[in-house]
């Protein structure tokens, strides 16, 4: 939500201490701290966080990786534990985004010329933003959803809105959610249109928030209490991918290939198939994104 009375370190501290308390451990047990923060990536959030929750001399990794920043911090802790370098680590992701405005490209400047010349470090043409597409996140995922609908059929404005209806209903079950208000399908469809087919209620808001997790090795876990062992969640796979080069991505980013690749590798490492899943927690930055990624996870 919005926390004008708390800064980034306050939010990170609250999440970190909550995770440590929930796990029944302390900073003295941690062998690594991985801190993810994109908007203040040069601020050394991890070191600032240490000053609030405990400075024990352990290595700190500050990571910034766009929408995957928090997940990358978690993966950093997982890799450190998996390598055998440490037995236990703490991962934290935090952002202060309330009031940050539109994320993505800033739009086409008024001083920009219409002249089209090949340029750029990667051999790309001049920016397409504001000409034949957009790099702003609402625009990108609106295009992604429409492209998916044209390619496969079966989608509609109402179908995308039903995804948001379901998610708003789920929010009422989580006291820590940014918004905990159920919304009707009609309210969602009649809300302010941001980028068709996503209305405001179908877009994730820019919020302040933080999350944290304690990662522990299997051997270390066996030395902890039975209750700690019972509540521990096994990490069967953690995968990070990037986009392979495609010429068309200069106009519209391909959010599908890297997701499909990550899912495929994760299933292989975990030794399961999509049909084995009982629950999926899926990043729903926009309602259109959720539907597209259903398919990408199959």
Where are these regions (language model features)?
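Conserved active-site "lid/cap" helical segment
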Residues: 1-68, 144-157, 163, 178-184, ...
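Condensing-enzyme catalytic core mediating Claisen C-C bond formation in acyl metabolism
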Residues: 1-9, 18, 122-131, 151, ...
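Short acidic, glycine/serine/threonine-rich loops at helix termini
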Residues: 3-5, 100-106, 172-175, 226, ...
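Short coil/turn connectors at secondary-structure junctions
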Residues: 27-30, 56-59, 83-89, 155-159, ...
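Conserved catalytic cysteine-centered active-site region
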Residues: 37-88, 92, 96, 100-101, ...
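Short glycine/threonine-rich loop-to-helix capping motif typified by GTGT followed
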Residues: 40-50, 247-251, 284-298
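Active-site-proximal alpha-helical scaffold in enzymes
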Residues: 64-95, 138-173, 213-219
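Functionally critical mobile loop/hinge segments
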Residues: 132-142, 146-204, 211, 228-230
């Amino acid at each position: 939500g919005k926390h004008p009375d708390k800064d980034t370190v306050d939010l990170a501290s609250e999440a970190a201490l909550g995770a440590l308390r929930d796990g029944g451990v302390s900073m003295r047990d941690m062998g690594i701290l991985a801190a993810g923060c994109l908007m203040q990536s040069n601020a050394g959030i991890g070191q600032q966080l240490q000053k609030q929750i405990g400075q024990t001399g352990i290595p700190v990794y500050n990571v910034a990786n766009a929408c995957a920043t928090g997940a990358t911090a978690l993966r950093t802790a997982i890799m450190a534990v998996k390598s055998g370098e440490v037995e236990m680590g703490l991962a934290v992701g935090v952002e202060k985004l309330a009031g940050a405005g539109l994320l993505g490209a800033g739009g086409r400047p008024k001083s920009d010329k219409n002249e089209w010349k090949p340029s750029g470090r990667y051999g790309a043409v001049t920016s397409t933003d504001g000409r034949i597409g957009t790099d702003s996140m609402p625009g990108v995922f609106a295009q992604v959803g429409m492209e998916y609908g044209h390619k496969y059929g079966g989608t509609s404005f109402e179908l995308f809105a039903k995804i948001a209806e379901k998610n708003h209903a789920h929010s009422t079950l989580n006291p820590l959610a940014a918004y905990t208000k159920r919304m009707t399908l009609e309210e969602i469809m009649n809300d302010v249109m941001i980028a068709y087919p996503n209305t405001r209620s179908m877009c994730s808001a820019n919020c302040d928030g933080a999350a944290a997790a304690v990662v522990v090795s299997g051997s270390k876990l066996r030395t902890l209490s039975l209750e700690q062992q019972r509540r521990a969640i096994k990490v069967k796979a953690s995968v990070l991918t990037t986009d392979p080069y495609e010429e068309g991505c200069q106009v519209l980013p391909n959010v599908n290939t890297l997701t499909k690749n990550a899912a495929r590798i994760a299933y292989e490492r975990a030794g399961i198939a999509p049909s084995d899943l009982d629950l999926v927690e899926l990043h729903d930055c926009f309602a259109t994104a959720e539907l597209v990624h259903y398919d990408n996870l199959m």
